[in-house]
UniProtKB/Swiss-Prot annotation:
Pfam families: SPOUT_MTase_2, THUMP. Residues 45-148 form the THUMP domain. This is Uncharacterized protein MJ0421. InterPro entries: Alpha/beta_knot_MTases, MJ0421-like_THUMP, SPOUT_MTase_fused_to_THUMP, THUMP_dom, tRNA_sulfurtransferase_ThiI. Signal peptide: none annotated. GO terms for biological process: tRNA methylation. One of its GO terms (molecular function) is tRNA (guanine) methyltransferase activity. Coiled coil: none annotated. PANTHER family: TRNA SULFURTRANSFERASE (PTHR43209:SF1). It comes from Methanocaldococcus jannaschii (strain ATCC 43067 / DSM 2661 / JAL-1 / JCM 10045 / NBRC 100440).
Length: 360
């Protein structure tokens, strides 16, 4: 019986040495084909539970089948895999390919997945599958593991999707201006944050005439940071990701344009209210408004004259100030806490009401 053990790079021998203390007899390969973070273990017994006792182990895949690393032979394993997937179950194929071959991970996912589907009549579900077929491709050998979908699932039906809120959020960011290299660095952080939260739009909004070249460097940084995060998202998510639109508009004109049509204007500033004091009303408005405009300052805060036009002025962390690059993550995480927390409270109230109506 073989197991593929995944660790942080450089921890492979630590795992092996710890395993020797709790398992009497096993064979192992450290960093197969030179790929760090992998240990392949073979034992006469099922030692998965013992392997998981080692803190340095991040993941264990029990090998169900192995074959030579040949596209047709890998796909033909569907004949064996079908016995582990029922017609009324859903499944997904996840391939991790190491090294150069004449096929891609996507090729395996598509063709093997299609053959399993034909053989089982099971449905493919890339988000919440009942079973996951893991295909681990090395230079000469390929291993297949089958796990319950929830075992390593990031996205479960029980978890609210934060995109419910963030897809309605427009970030209005005052640009960081000054030394050009610093402008660019701050721009990168802003671009990464806006793309990371997949907001509806990022508006770069200077409040007055500014140095064109300083602004240009800031915007260059935004683009670099945004695309850097976007490339990671494309690899990490099992669904399509879009680039967040980035525009430039005068700060005061943004306020004029957005003060209508069922929109919510929020300014983050130390002069505002604590979230705990406004969270109930804010949660209601976050749900009802079609668009949420969040204003973030830079070296200077949002001009005080605009406070009159905001629906909320929020102090995210009383007696503390955030660095420019932390404003977007701090604001959005705080708003998500308010938005999702309202659901939990409503759920609790509903459960309590139901219990009372049942005479409990």
């Amino acid at each position: 019986m073989k197991f593929i053990i995944k660790t942080q790079k450089g921890f492979e021998n630590i795992v092996v040495n710890n395993l020797k203390e709790i398992v009497d007899d096993f064979n192992y390969i450290v960093s197969p084909d030179g790929y760090q973070g992998i240990v392949i273990v073979e034992s006469d017994e099922d030692i998965e539970d013992k392997i998981l006792q080692i803190p340095e182990v991040e993941r264990v895949l029990k090998v169900y089948f192995e074959t030579e690393t040949d596209f047709d032979k890998i796909v033909n394993l569907a004949e064996k895999i079908k016995d582990y997937i029922k017609e009324d179950e859903t499944f997904a194929v996840e391939t991790k390919k190491r090294g150069k071959h004449d096929f891609s991970s996507t090729d395996i996912n598509i063709v093997l997945g299609a053959k399993i589907k034909d053989l089982t009549n099971a449905s493919v579900d890339l988000n919440n599958p009942d079973k996951v077929v893991h295909v681990e491709v090395f230079k000469n050998k390929t291993y297949v593991s089958i796990t319950p979908g929830e075992k390593f699932k990031k996205y479960t039906k029980e978890k609210r999707n934060a995109r419910e809120l963030f897809k309605k959020v427009v970030i209005v960011q005052m640009p960081y201006l000054g030394e050009k290299i610093v402008c660019k660095r701050f721009g990168e952080a802003i671009g990464r944050a806006a793309q990371g939260f997949e907001v509806k739009e990022l508006i770069i909004a200077p409040k007055e005439k500014v140095d064109a070249y300083e602004l240009m460097e800031f915007i260059k940084g935004v683009k670099i940071g945004q695309h850097s995060r976007y490339e990671i998202q494309k690899r990490a998510y099992p669904f399509e990701i879009k680039l967040v639109p980035v525009t430039v508009q005068d700060l005061y004109q943004v306020v004029r344009d957005k003060r209508r049509d069922n929109r919510l204007l929020i300014i983050t500033d130390p002069k505002g209210d604590e979230l705990s004091k406004i969270k109930d009303k804010l949660a209601y408005d976050l749900r009802k408004k079609r668009e949420i405009i969040v204003f973030c300052g830079s070296r200077e805060g949002i001009p005080r004259g605009l406070f009159r036009f905001a629906d909320y002025i929020v102090d995210l962390a009383p007696h503390m100030t955030f660095a420019t690059e932390h404003a977007i993550p701090a604001a959005l995480i705080a708003l998500w806490g308010v938005y999702s927390g309202e659901d939990l409270e409503n759920s609790s109230k509903e459960e309590k009401t139901e219990s009372n109506s049942n005479g409990e």
